[in-house]
């Protein structure tokens, strides 16, 4: 295979060492600003660090650097559980299915946002037409953007729940690795709460907590929602399920690349390439992009790439389409 022959599946230890040191330096700089009483800039910088750590746990959990999966797992516990507060195993539990069945209704857990949002019309069937939830659905395209900053808080809570249940998980692997994840999360909250403790008063602590987590949440969410929510969803019975490449290309939208975007988005602006080659390291996605474009053109497949505002508007339109259906259903009983 050409991508393997050109070494595009090989991760660079120097690249990942630099990225880890870069995020640790960002955290230390946030500590320093806090020490100098620049509390708001410190909180914002912590949010940036947590976003960047999100890309690193994503990459190590995809086994992009080491050939030995055990070393990738250890790295994911460090950048994920300890530094970030996210469960490595919990991430794999949902994300691996997302890759195998991207935007497939009833399989891709990323589509399951009920009761707050309906990503497909089928979700409306689960609620009565006079339910208050249907009112939320009617206006979901309006309040969607306001919920993006809360993504990190949601993932933190999900991580705590998942890790607490790991010792009794039905997968033997999770039972064996539960202690690593539990220690990692415990240490994360130890240093994270200690950081808040050294702030001068409760009002500053509350400000710091919410600013750092909401900034980190928005920086994560504006990326991870762009790629798939703006495109079509498919039924499990669809013929596209028999062609992995078609499924990934037709359910994914890229963000236009650039130096700043490549850094800010952690390489996920090359989401089509990432979905076709999940274990390909971030620093090679730009190189493989022309090959993927050529493959799409030769096979009559769309290669969707847009600027952020175009993609975000298409994302909003997808939610509005479902909102319109919800509005019609509720009007029938008005």
Residue ranges: model-predicted function:
Residues 299, 329-334:
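C-terminal regulatory/interaction regions
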Residues 212-225, 229-230, 293-298, 302:
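C-terminal, active-site-flanking charged/polar segments
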Residues 46-170, 237-326:
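Membrane-embedded catalytic scaffold of the fatty acid hydroxylase/desaturase
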Residues 161-168, 198-201, 230:
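Juxtamembrane transmembrane-helix termini
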